[in-house]
Structures are given as structure tokens and as C-alpha cells.
Amino acid sequence: MTATLSLYNASVPGLIRMMDNLEHILRMGQTNAEDRGIDPSVFLTARLAPDMLGLVGQVQVATSIAKACPFRLAGTTPPVYDDQDNASFDDLYALIERTRSDISSVTREQIDGREAVEFNVKMGPVERSFTGISYSSGFTIPNVYFHITTVYNILRHNGVPLGKLDFFGGPSALG
């Protein structure tokens, strides 16, 4: 059987994988905080620069963008989460699990064939126009990677011994 690259294949499996990787990075951070006797809030509120979101905010944005993608590609409204309760590592794991579940709920049949379908997304005060493929490959995937990389960098900057393989979900994730 020959695999083909479809809009579904280019988005949904990778987004789920990115959520798995994000969870791995956070678990490394939580374990490191426990091992070093550091209050978890030190990591959860840390940021790379004063004008950037802290770790919790980075996770919230990564999950928000990731979960919206398949719904927008399918032409449906993405679920909205109440991000007020994300104050612990366990809260972030629950957010990631909910995101994975919502991403997985959109089917291949709902997405494939919609590569050229045009739609608008309101981003703050501005509305942007996309096609399915430009939204997935030009907006969603780069943004999710950016915010997950920032989580990785925040933890790394705070002494968590993360390596490149951890970004990909750990050594066992690559097979």
C-alpha cells in the first residue's frame, strides 16, 4: 500500500505527536523540579524575556493553535477552553490530553480534499485569509513548534537537562 500526503496526513498525526512531545518535555521539567527541591511554580511562571508569555502561557497557546487546526480545516468551529485553571503541571497534562482528544475527533474524511478551501481566521483585531494548506503548513505547524520550542528553552534555561531527543519525545519516541 502506498501512502499519500494528504491534508489530514500533513496535519493531524503531526499535531498529536507534537502534543506527546510537549508532555514529555513538561514531565522532564516536573521531575527535575522535584529532584532539585524547586517549587514547580518557579518553572511554570518562568519566561525567556519580559515581553514573552511564561511557560503556562506558551503551553496554552501551543494547545490552542493545535486543537483549532483540524476543526478549521474541516470548516467547523474549534472548541474553546477555559485557560484559567492551568496552574500546575497536572493541569497542563490534562490540557494536553484534552487537546489530543479534540484533534483526534476530526476525521480524515472531514479534512482531506479541503487543501484549497479558503477561510478567514480572526486574530486579535485582524482577520486573516487562508487556504487549508496555507493554514496548516504556513501558520499552524510553525506556530505550534515555536511555542513548544519556547517551553523547551524556558526549562533548559532553568537547568532542566533536556537534550535534542527530548524535543522529539525522548529516545524511545524515535523507535
Predicted regions span which residues?
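C-terminal end-helix/capping segment
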Residues: 156-175
